[in-house]
């Protein structure tokens, strides 16, 4: 009897595909054709059109700019952006991102977290009742 693989993740063979399409096929598609492959929320966002400033960000990608800085966290990552560098503002600083094929269809903000995990240190002297009687060093 053949032994089954216990891994739940699909094994990666060859190049990346998005909904059955290779990256080269995706890059040849128009926005409307690509939108048909996306979930409903992203598809509706594309059909509603882009603002002038969002069109400016897309134009910077097309012009081959080395790194694009933006505050647009809700913009969708398109196949033509693959391999480019992006800097997304998280409210404090610009977070550098290199766009990979696995990021297609996601939004810029997903890769630029706005909140960091807080790791608190130990309590100070006098912070708790038991620490009042601890001698200072």
UniProtKB/Swiss-Prot annotation:
Pfam families found in the cross-reference section: Ribosomal_S19 (PF00203)
Origin: domain of life: Archaea
BP terms from Gene Ontology: ribosomal small subunit assembly; translation
Stored PANTHER family: RIBOSOMAL PROTEIN S19P FAMILY MEMBER, SMALL RIBOSOMAL SUBUNIT PROTEIN US19
Protein name, UniProt field: Small ribosomal subunit protein uS19
Example of a GO cellular component annotation carried by this entry: cytosolic small ribosomal subunit
Region (Disordered): 115-137
Keywords in alphabetical order: Ribonucleoprotein, Ribosomal protein, RNA-binding, rRNA-binding
Keyword rRNA-binding assigned: yes
Native source organism of the sequence: Methanococcoides burtonii (strain DSM 6242 / NBRC 107633 / OCM 468 / ACE-M)
Function according to Swiss-Prot or TrEMBL: Protein S19 forms a complex with S13 that binds strongly to the 16S ribosomal RNA.
Protein family (similarity comment): Belongs to the universal ribosomal protein uS19 family.
InterPro entries, alphabetized: Ribosomal_uS19, Ribosomal_uS19_CS, Ribosomal_uS19_euk/arc, Ribosomal_uS19_SF
One Gene Ontology MF term: rRNA binding
């Amino acid at each position: 009897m053949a032994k089954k693989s216990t891994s739940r993740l699909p094994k990666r063979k060859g190049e990346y595909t998005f909904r059955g399409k290779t990256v080269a096929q995706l890059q040849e598609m128009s926005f409307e054709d690509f939108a048909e492959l996306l979930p409903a929320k992203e598809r509706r966002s594309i059909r509603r059109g882009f603002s002038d400033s969002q069109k400016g960000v897309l134009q910077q990608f097309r012009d081959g700019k080395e790194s694009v800085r933006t505050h647009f966290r809700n913009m969708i990552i398109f196949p033509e952006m693959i391999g480019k560098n992006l800097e997304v503002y998280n409210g404090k600083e610009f977070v550098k991102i290199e766009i990979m094929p696995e990021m297609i269809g996601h939004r810029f903000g997903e890769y630029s977290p706005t909140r960091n995990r807080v790791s608190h240190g130990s309590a100070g002297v006098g912070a708790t009742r038991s620490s009042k009687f601890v001698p200072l060093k």
